[in-house]
Amino acid sequence: MREDEGLSPPQYPGDDTRPTSRKELAGWYSYSWAAEVFTVCAMGSFLPITLEQMARDRGVLLSDKVTPCQATWKAPKQLSPHETLSQTLINALRYGRDVPGASQCVVYIFGVEVNTASFAMYTFSVSVLVQAVLIISMSGAADHGTYRKVFLLTFALVGSISTMSFLSVVPKLYLLGALFAIIANTCFGASFVLLNSFLPLLVRYHPSLLRGRNEISRQGAMGDDTWGNTSHDVNNVTTPLLRSAQVDNGTITENAARVSLADTSLELELSTRISSYGIGIGYIGAVLLQIVCILVVISTHQTTFSLRLVLFVIGLWWFVFTIPAALWLRPRPGPPLSCAQDGKQHSWPGYIIHAWKSLGRTVIRTRRLKDIMLFLASWFLLSDGIATVSGTAVLFAKTQLGMQPAALGMINVVAMLAGVFGAFSWSYISRLLNLRASQTIIACIILFELVPLYGLLGFIPAIRDLGFLGLQQPWEMFPLSIVYGLVMGGLSSYCRSFFGELIPPGYEAAFYALYAITDKGSSIFGPAVVGIVTDRYGEIRPAFVFLAILILLPLPLMLLVDVDRGKRDALALSAELEGSQELNAPTYGAVPCNRNDSESAVVQSE
């Protein structure tokens, strides 16, 4: 397809309607390859234990509040000439650390006693809070004007450099390490939201979609020329992959409806394929780097420096593979934000206020959709449980099972492989048992509940006397990581698609934005509560009680969701909003203000 074939006229200054190129897609995939390693290798494995270990190196034993914890860290033996790297890895998986068990340590932060494991959990909670506020606040500026790519590259640069900076953080500066972790996680989350905002545009201007759209338009030209004379709305250009049909004097024309449905089908198919490729490429890169990190940790004798070196490698990977994205990904500017009453361009505070007001409007409308509210409440708890269990498990394995960093890294590899398997197997299981999406999600919740319940078995005296079961031995972490991965694969596959069935047609962008905010903002609470429980009892195991409750709470909420009722309510709200001529918006959780008549006239004339 030629560059100018099927080219839509620009709808605003700077509008880039060129067909999506292979190089542009490669740039989009490149950033997924670059940044996914942070959430998998850093947040999922090495960052929590690095923060805990640096705090431990400056802490004292909980038992006497005097003995330095640094003295309790015994590095594994040096590699002997006759011991291969693979043998060392096997020993790490089998035996954990050389020191049986692990001593609980505390550190004093501004005079407050904090368990070293809690220190890592508190850091994660703060980073999620900052990330959620930043994502909402920047959404207006990111979706309007030329800021999208600039923000993406800026966050990638700051996040990768913050991760690499761990190499210079010595234990006595462990608070600086926490600051770097907060900055890195915040930048990662913000950059991925920006990356995902490119997806609708890559799909909309993809050559295959343009060809299909033109062919459908030609076929319907004899019956109705509405589609051919209707351009994309200015406020709709960065939006939802799903769009409502064109309306003519309040009535959806037959050809417009047919074209819109066909166009939507093509977009959904293409967006699913591109998104799946991006996720797959990101996870392949993460697994490869995770294995490299494990080998680096083993070859450098699993010291605190080993952990800092691994984080440097992760940050370097993030930085280097962002370069192709910087070179190949087009800016794809969004429409200017033209809602200021005085007609002037919005200032930065104006963009921020617009973003929060837009989110508020969507939340208010959500109150009228009972089933969406039930699902989002359930998803809020589920998402919090998923993130909290991951961090808690790694820190529990380190501080109470005494597992070495290499073994902790392998736990994550096993969980990821199980997640990939789960993403495919749950679909087969659902078809085999004729399960609806909601029933599959409920099955995942029940299976997920087994993880904290298994940890609670360690409180039963008879099981505790056995010396195994109930998470008393390092090897028990690996079967549980398989269960966790299977659950993750199922929930990630089904929750988003199930939520899509409840959304008012034509308002997907606003409600999926609310879904994403619920996902990203939920993890503020779980890690903080685990940290408080750990500080109170001096160990992590009692926090399994909280995790069991947190994972169980979504179950009754999900059982209350009525899909048929939710669809009816969504259609009713959509019809009401269409009647009032309100259009869905590109900003995070936005349903934008109406344009004035002069703006509408400009669009129609173009």
Curated annotation (Swiss-Prot):
Protein name: Autophagy-related protein 22-1
Gene name linked to the record: atg22-1
Entry keyword set: Amino-acid transport, Autophagy, Glycoprotein, Membrane, Transmembrane, Transmembrane helix, Transport, Vacuole
InterPro entries assigned to the protein according to its UniProt record, in alphabetical order: Atg22, Atg22-like, ATG22/LtaA_families, MFS_trans_sf
Phylogenetic placement of the source organism: Eukaryota, Fungi, Dikarya, Ascomycota, Pezizomycotina
Membrane topology of the entry: Multi-pass membrane protein
Transmembrane segments: 31-51, 116-136, 150-170, 175-195, 278-298, 309-329, 372-392, 406-426, 441-461, 478-500, 512-534, 543-563
Origin: domain of life: Eukaryota
Gene3D superfamilies with a match to the protein in the record: MFS general substrate transporter like domains
Task performed by this protein: Vacuolar effluxer which mediate the efflux of amino acids resulting from autophagic degradation. The release of autophagic amino acids allows the maintenance of protein synthesis and viability during nitrogen starvation.
Principal cellular location given in the protein's record: membrane
UniProt cross-references to CDD domains, sorted A to Z: MFS_Atg22_like (cd17483)
Entry annotated with the keyword Oxidoreductase: no
